[in-house]
Amino acid sequence: MRQIAIYGKGGIGKSTTTQNLTAALGESGKKIMIVGCDPKADSTRLILGGLTQKTVMDTLREEGEDIDLEDILKPGFSGIKCVESGGPEPGVGCAGRGIITSINMLESLGAYESDLDYVFYDVLGDVVCGGFAMPIREGKAQEIYIVASGELMALYAANNIAKGIQKYAKSGGTRLGGIICNSRQVDYEHELLEAFAKELGSQLIYFVPRDNIVQRAEINKKAVIEFEPECGQANEYRALAKSIDENKMFVIPKPMHTDRLEELMMEHGVLG
């Protein structure tokens, strides 16, 4: 069983990418569980056809500790098992704690004991704070992929996440599997992302082009592969899934200084 965490800045398309990627893996016959690690609890809605899933934290609050796996785990497209960790009520407590509680709960209920090929953790945002670092800090996820684009703030966030991976890699055994570009159609984006990944000592594992069908599928509460399986974008997600399934390059990243990051962007005509 491979345990993979997907990180990236807020709004980069991390949850969309994760769900379309897992739909492609599921279609190919892989057994998958997605654990949504975002208080918004939107990591599984395309797999579940728009079903707003009750989160682990809400279930615990309403029903106490005596819960069954079926209460928090729902099957969706291609039999993909879906869990949303959720978080505390707004303004109260640390959302990262929800991730810790959820993973511990899933372990105690035997969720990891089935014949899974993959567990994906879709993790909130720009910071790798204590709670959100849980999947890598505790060595739950052995592989990390960072979703980025050719925009400055996306690369700042990716570089910060690389710092977090570097910090925990030595103790937890986690490695960076690569950068996934979710294209924003920025000039020289492909070249910039390849250079950025190389600078980290990693690879651009896949460049996902921008296509409006992704939004159309989202409005219809489906992954692209379910919504329009024969379209070009569905094949892009299949190719991304194949790249990750066959990946053999796992590194401790070498994050760069901010000055070097800005220099890299100037070299590729993004700044200046």
Swiss-Prot record:
Catalytic activity field: N2 + 8 reduced [2Fe-2S]-[ferredoxin] + 16 ATP + 16 H2O = H2 + 8 oxidized [2Fe-2S]-[ferredoxin] + 2 NH4(+) + 16 ADP + 16 phosphate + 6 H(+)
E.C. code: 1.18.6.1
Sites where the protein binds ATP: 8-15
Taxonomic superkingdom: Bacteria
GO molecular function ontology, one term from the record: nitrogenase activity
Quaternary structure note: Homodimer.
Coiled-coil spans in chain: none
Lineage: Bacteria, Bacillati, Bacillota, Clostridia, Peptostreptococcales
PTM per Swiss-Prot/TrEMBL: The reversible ADP-ribosylation of Arg-97 inactivates the nitrogenase reductase and regulates nitrogenase activity.
Gene symbol of the encoding locus: nifH
InterPro entries xrefs: NifH/chlL_CS, NifH/frxC, Nitrogenase_Fe_NifH, P-loop_NTPase
Record-linked Pfam families: Fer4_NifH
Protein name according to UniProt: Nitrogenase iron protein
Residues at which [4Fe-4S] cluster binds: 94, 129
Modified residues (ADP-ribosylarginine): 97
Binding note for cofactor: Binds 1 [4Fe-4S] cluster per dimer.
Requisite cofactors: [4Fe-4S] cluster
Record organism: Alkaliphilus metalliredigens (strain QYMF)
